[in-house]
Amino acid sequence: MSPAAGPKRWALSGRIVTMAAEGDVIKSGTIFIEDSRIAAVVPKGQPAPTGFETTNPVATGGTIYPGLIELHNHLSYNILPLWQVPQPYGNRDQWQNAKSYKTSVTGPMSAIALADDGSLLPALVRYVEAKCMVAGTTTSQGITLSNWSGTIHKYYKGALRAAEIGSPPDLPRAHSKIPDIDAEDWAKFDKELKSSSCFLLHLSEGIDTKAHSHFLALRNPQGDWAIEPSLAGIHCTALDATDFGTMAENHAKVVWSPLSNLLLYGKTTDVAAARTAGLTIALGSDWSPSGSKNLLGELKAAKVVSAHFNLGFSDFDIVAMATRNPAAILKWDAKLGTIAKGKFADLLVVKGVTGDPYAHLIKSREQDIVLVTIGGRPRYGTKTVMQKAGGSGEALKIGSSARVIDFSSPDQDPGIEKVSLAEATSRLKAALGSLGALQTDSLAMSDAIARGTVSRTGWRLALDEQFGNNVQLRPRLAYDGVRTGPDLAAVAVTDEPLHPIKLDGLTVAGDPVFLDTLKNESNLPPGIAAGIAVFY
């Protein structure tokens, strides 16, 4: 019998931004990693911990942060480019019915999901996970899969952490799906909230009275609120200071997507009022049709929006919204969100060690990322640093810089083909370039699903809009006799003719049209797009 393998030990050095508190920065230090966890955080000049005496740290030449945690992103849609929003809307049900939305978002995604011959799902999950990792995101929302008849659902297991999968008991699973029957019954909905550690709920997305009614629907006729400490309200754009006070009284939280709010509504959540009320706030980039390309981009949007509207958020506040705050909202803060002994080694290293450490991350571009680790495993980085860290994987380029990315995982979803990023990119480009041909097959499959005559085995995408997943998490509680949830039929497979579209670029650096498209978005207040472009 061969001896059991010992723990994997390695280390990396650089400037360390722990995010434990503002100013808690080690100008030069080393993080020692044993298997999936941080064994020690040691300033320069102090001895290595026991067991690491002969370990040579990887000199990153960069600043080390906790990996970014995103609490709002519909990853399945992140192959689509920015939608040119034709007008400002009052609530999400309005833009869902726009003709250009159906041909730019609903139609293409239905074609990809329902006309899939088995080659597109593996390509899509590979591509959208890469979009996260190359921008330093180590946790995001999960990708929902369904069997072909739509009766069984699960979350895809890949290289990223998924909030809805977690790793119990250390990282409890978040809830982010409400079956209609639960949402229509106030008591059942409230019970669901009480039993959850974190409930990610789309809440009052929009700026009009109808959007606000979704919040009022959380109150029953007796005056009790279905608001619990587990509730993390995504968007909350229709809420005012009084509403945020109600949320704070019940210890709820807020997830903010400033760029998406402005693109669709021309206004954003009153996060200053939310903060004044004492609410914890996290960031989410939403999705590529109306949002930042990644969470690193959303940090920039948050800074620009805060300055534009004089919201008063510091650079530390903004970085906290993508690290310590979301970890606390998920109840993961004992294991993630800050850099400390015993926590999981989910880390992000950005080139350079000078200047304000929080502004340094906000200003960084995708091509400035040196290394990303998840659970102590080097997942993405420069070719040189990945080699020194013992990582391996597929070669790619970000701008003109050589990078390596590793998707492999022992518990990766066994039912999904493992394809390279290059192959995934090729498949998706071809599919999006032939949407008209795919549309016929997708309409036929949609009809077969509706009639219950589907005989295919395996898994397909369960698109958020059509199957009531993440995007539909607003409550559908009765309010003055009216259902407050959206009509899923309104976003069913479209028969509007589809035309070829281009695959959304993996990064801003690799997308020559992203910033110009953003500048042409009519709902953005003057200066927002230009302010974001300055960072690139």
Task: Report residues per predicted region.
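Active-site microenvironment of metallo-dependent hydrolases
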Residues: 1-51, 73-173, 187-192, 320-536
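Charged catalytic cores and adjacent phosphate/nucleic-acid-binding surfaces used
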Residues: 252, 278-279, 309-312, 316, ...
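Active-site metal-binding motif and surrounding structural segment of the metallo-beta-lactamase
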Residues: 46-65, 70
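Active-site core of metal-dependent hydrolases
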Residues: 142-289, 307, 312
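Active-site loop ensemble at the mouth of alpha/beta enzyme cores that anchors a bound cofactor
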Residues: 276, 284, 291-306, 368
